[in-house]
Structures are given as C-alpha cells and as structure tokens.
Amino acid sequence: MEQGPQDGEPIEIKIIKEAYKKAFVFVNKGLNTDELGQKEEAKNYYKQGIGHLLRGISISSTDPEYTGPEWESARQMQQKMKETLQNVRTRLEILEKGLATSLRNDLQEVPKLYPEFPPKDMSEKSPEPQSLSSLPQHSEVNGSTSTASAESSSTPTTLSLPCQSHPSEAPPAYTPQAAEGHYTVSYGTESGEFSSVGENFYRNHSQPPPLETLGLDADELILIPNGVQIFFVNPAGEVSAPSYPGYLRIVRFLDNSLDTFLNRPPGFLQVCDWLYPLVPDRSPVLKCTVGAYMFPDTMLQASGCFVGVVLSSELPEDDRELFEDLLRQMSDLRLQTNWDRAEGENEFQIPGISGSASDQLKEASGTDVRQLDPSSKDVRQKGKRGKKTKGTSSEEVNLSHIVPCEPVSEEKAKELPEWSEKVAHNILSGASWVSWGLVKGAEFTGKAIQKGASKLRERIQPEEKPVEVSPAVTKGLYMAKQATGGAAKVSQFLVDGVCTVANCVGKELAPHVKKHGSKLVPESLKKDRNGKSTLDGAMVVAASSVQGFSTVWQGLECAAKCIVNNVSAETVQTVRYKYGHTAGEATHNAVDSAINVGVTAYNIDNIGIKAMVKKTAKQTGHTLLEDYKIIDNSKGENPGGGASANLKGEKDEQKEGPEKNGAKKKDK
C-alpha cells in the first residue's frame, strides 16, 4: 500500500476522493443542463461523470489491512458513487432513447383550450353555424372567460379573431349541437351537468411527471394521486372556481449541499401544475378553520395572490395527517384563530377572501421565500382553473364535504360512568390518607428513637479516657465516605439520565400506542347502554390507581428517609457520648458510607436494560393515562390538605414534609 509523500495518506484513498469530487462536479453539471433542456450537453456531462465514478469504484477497499476512519470514509464514498452510477445510467438511457422530458417542459406545456377528439363521420356532422356574425359576440364571451381563468394576472389577455381561412381554429358557436370540428364535452340537465367524455379524459391530464425528471436526489415524501383541488384568489378578492380533482405530492431533495448551487429550495409542494417551495420555518402556510390550506402564489409576480388547497373528505385519515405533519416540518404552518361563517350561508365561501385569514396569510407571506425557478413563475395550465364536470363513476371522489379544522382549545367532554368517578375519588382519598399516615408514623417513630436514645445515654457511663482511634482508620473511613458519596452521586446522575430518556421515549410511544391500541378494543367495551364510555371509565380508575400508588410510594420514601436519619443521628450521638468525639466521628463516617453503599446499589439496579424497559413502559402508561386524571376538590376530607390527582402537586407536598421535619430537629 503506497503512502502519500506529504501527509502519509494512502494513494488509493486520494484517488477515491479525487474521483468522487470530479464525478459529482460533472453529474451536477449534467443535472443543470438537463433541467434547462440541453439534452446533448447533459449526456456528455453524464458520460464524463460515469467515467470518474467507475474509476473511483474500481479501487479495492475491502482488504483486511485497510482499516481506520480514513478507509471507512472511503468505503462510504464508494457506496454513494455506486448508487449514483446506477441512477446516472438510468437517466442516460432515458435520454438516449428520447422517452422523457424535463420537469420544466412538462409544466410549461400549456394544453390547448379545447381537447382534441377524432373527427366524426360525415353523416354525423352537425350543421354549420348560422353565420359568422355570431363570432364577435362569442369571442367577447370567451375573452372574458379566459380573463377570468387567469384572474391573477394584472393585464387581461384579449382573444383575437381567427382567420377565416382556418375555420377549424375558430371557437365553437353556441348552437344546439356542436359545430363542425368540435365535440360536446358536457351538457346540462335538470339534475345537473354531466360529462360526455368520461373520467379517463380528465385523469390522463392529471398524472404527476416522473420523479427522475427532478434529479437524482429527489425523494417523494407523499403522493395523493387524486382528490385534491386548488382555487386562486387575486389581489382584488376575486376567487376562481375550484379545479378538477388532481394529484398532490411533496418532494424533498436529499443533497442539501446542492441547494445553493442549483438555486432550489430544500423541497416543494406540487398540486397538478402549481408549485410552492417549502423552506422550514420560512414558507408561510395557513390552515383555515374550514379545512383549506392557503399559500402565497409564488409563481406569479403580482403580490397579494393566494392559492387554496382543498383535500377531499374521502381521503384516508393517514394521508391527511401525513400531509399536515410534513407541512409542519417543512414550512411555517399556522392555524387560523377565528373565522365565523355568516348565518344562512349555503354556499362554501373561500376563506381566502375573509378578513382574518387573508390578513394572517399576508402577514406571514412577507417572509422571503426562494423560488423553484425564476422563469417558472408564470407557468400554469389555464385549462384546469375552471371547474370541470365529471360523470357518475364508481370511483368518483366526493368533494362536496370539506373536513373542518376543529379548534385545539375545545376538547370534547368525556361522558364517564358514575361508578368510575366514585372509585377514582375513593382511591385518591385512601392513598392520601395512607401517605399522610406513613409520614406521621415516621415522625412519631423518630421521636420515639430520640427518646429511647436519650434514656440509653442516661444509663451509660462515659469512659474516663476517650477511646483513641488510629489516624489511619479515621482517614480510611473518611475516604470511604467520600468515595461512596461520589459513587452515589454518579449512580444517581446515571439513573436520572435513564429516567429522562425513558420519559422521552415513553411520551413519544404513547400517542402511537393509544392510536393503534384503541383499534384492538371491541366496540362493546367502548360504550354501555346509556351511551357512556365504559373504556374511559376503566381508564380513569387505572389513572387514579397509578396516582394513588405514586402518593403512597412518596409517603414511604419520605418516611424511610426520616427514620434512617434519626437512627443515624442518635447512633453517632450515643457513640460520641460513650467513647469520645474521635470515635463518634469515625462512626459517623462509617454509617454514612453504609448508607451511600445502599443508595448506590439501589441506583445501579435501576440502570440496566430491564430497568430501562420498565421505566419506558411505565412512562408510556403514565402518558396514556394523562388525559384521564381527575382532581379531588374535597379539601375537608384530606388531612393533608386535599387529595389532588396532579402528581406534581403531591410531589411538592411530599417535598415540604421533610423540610418541616428538619426544622423541628433544628429547634430541638
């Protein structure tokens, strides 16, 4: 294995690093030219990148003597180069066959105003329009229609009259039957408007472009193939009709180092032909109370334009939750505070024109958001802006109902059975009584120990000459006390760390356990005959049992500490009285060392894997029962000042107990 002349780095690692660097330079150049539509130049860059990738992969790095962090990094580079080589070869094969186009060409390809259909037979041709005099009137109507479909632009487009030498390019006349060269797309009836072309016609125009066209590092986080509509709001408050249901997807770029170089955001949201860049904590998104998501329209240069995204009520709940979770992670998602619908309002009012929603979004849209591409701002398929009709199909998605966003502060009151509340209050009250009794019993026990020790000292005759303890023994006991005290602190620190990790893991697991666990419970256990939740009642009793056990456990802990402190203090004082001050100090160090050893042993027992699993499971259960805790407001019944179901309050009460006991000792 050859070594580098300067820094001692193996020459093989240098070759791998150089090939890695040059390969990705050419691959990135190929991606840029590929996105710009320069296919031939992109293929040349891809081929050069493949050459460097093959060179870097050809170096052997699996020999046993190739060990260390440098070789591990080199192997990771080679693994990444292998994955990139496979993707580049796939893309190059697509380019050479001419089977794919770039994302920009897909989005800039504006469909024709009218769909193309095979010509009819001569026998079925509809009659010619009555006269060309109707064309100016019809063009004026179509002109206003096209202007309404592009309401976000500041300058309305005018529809010029077609040349009479090309009658097939003329817009259809409003005749009872379709004019020559045109086809009836939909027709109205008494029960509504029906489509005459079927669902497949619309679905073929709403398929997402291939993911390969976005680059080698594009990762599709979510794809909703159908059931998503968008509408547009211009600065004047005019709202377009919702588009025909289409697809939605969120794409993230894995290689963040290329974002600045390629002038692209970390990810983007795509709904049919509309794109929105997603930058964490910078891209404003407003979720309205009616369930629609409002975005600033960054594809237009005009300010004050917004886009609303509406999800179908028939979409799976998992897709809806995943979409909102991704928006929280990749944008600045905010919830609308309040929006009241007018009384007697039957039609769905787009929240983009309401004062509160519009103001909130305008305020948030002041953030500078990077665009996907400067030249793609005006790219839009105008044909999808208007609402298209659809036929009665078995796969039809119902978009008439929108899932509203319920306020977070309003919680549904649980209807609990009476027996559950009674049992829960009895458990809490009994636990408080037991805890109070333990603490009081420990206090009386401490007083009895002090009284007995004082009587014992009255009967003991002190030694005339104090017992001399060897300095080596005294120093050894003192060092043992210091060592065991340090071990106790370290073990306690480790236990606290384990508890912290277990608490975090338990809190993260609790929502998933609660969500999937409820599916396993039979419906017969969820509701009783009176419509009250039997399961919630059982959960309330379980939560109260956990709270009661915690209360009793804290009382036991407080009582044990009180008794141990009293026994230790009286033992040291008795030895000091009998054998002198030196022997008393040695006894004090020995007793403290014994206590520290016991505490350390207890802490070590709570650090193992089993203890970690137990604490995680226990914290998961506590978090699950958090919503079912109750508060016992009967202050007169509890001798300790009220049985509170809040564990934090009980901890504070138990902490105050030892402080009061300590104050009594000092007074004595």
From Swiss-Prot:
Instruction: Give the region (Ubiquitin-binding region (UBR) domain) as residue ranges.
Output: 190-380
Q: Can you give the residue ranges of the Senescence domain?
A: 427-611
Mod. after translation: Ubiquitinated; ubiquitination does not require ITCH and WWP1.
The annotated region (Required for localization to lipid droplets) lies at: 431-503
Please state where this protein is localized. Cytoplasm; Midbody; Lipid droplet
Keywords per UniProt: Acetylation, Cytoplasm, Isopeptide bond, Lipid degradation, Lipid droplet, Lipid metabolism, Lipid transport, Lipid-binding, Phosphoprotein, Transport, Ubl conjugation
**Compositional bias of kind Basic and acidic residues:** 118-127, 648-668
Locate the compositionally biased regions of type Low complexity.
Answer: 128-162
Ranges for the region named Disordered are: 110-176, 348-396, 631-668
Q: Which residues form the signal peptide?
A: none
> InterPro entries from the xrefs?
MIT_dom (IPR007330), MIT_dom_sf (IPR036181), Senescence/spartin_C (IPR009686), Spartin-like (IPR045036)
Superkingdom per UniProt: Eukaryota
Please indicate if the UniProt record lists Transport as a keyword. Answer: yes
Q: What is known of its domains?
A: The senescence domain is required and sufficient for lipid transfer.
Function summary = Lipophagy receptor that plays an important role in lipid droplet (LD) turnover in motor neurons. Localizes to LDs and interacts with components of the autophagy machinery, such as MAP1LC3A/C proteins to deliver LDs to autophagosomes for degradation via lipophagy. Lipid transfer protein required for lipid droplet degradation, including by lipophagy. Can bind and transfer all lipid species found in lipid droplets, from phospholipids to triglycerides and sterol esters but the direction of lipid transfer by spartin and its cargos are unknown.
- What do we know about how this protein assembles, alone or with others? Interacts with ITCH and WWP1. Interacts (via MIT domain) with IST1; leading to the recruitment of SPART to midbodies. Interacts with MAP1LC3A and MAP1LC3C.
**Which protein is depicted?**
Spartin
> Which species is this record about?
Bos taurus (Bovine)
What taxonomic classification does the UniProt entry list for its organism?
Eukaryota, Metazoa, Chordata, Craniata, Vertebrata
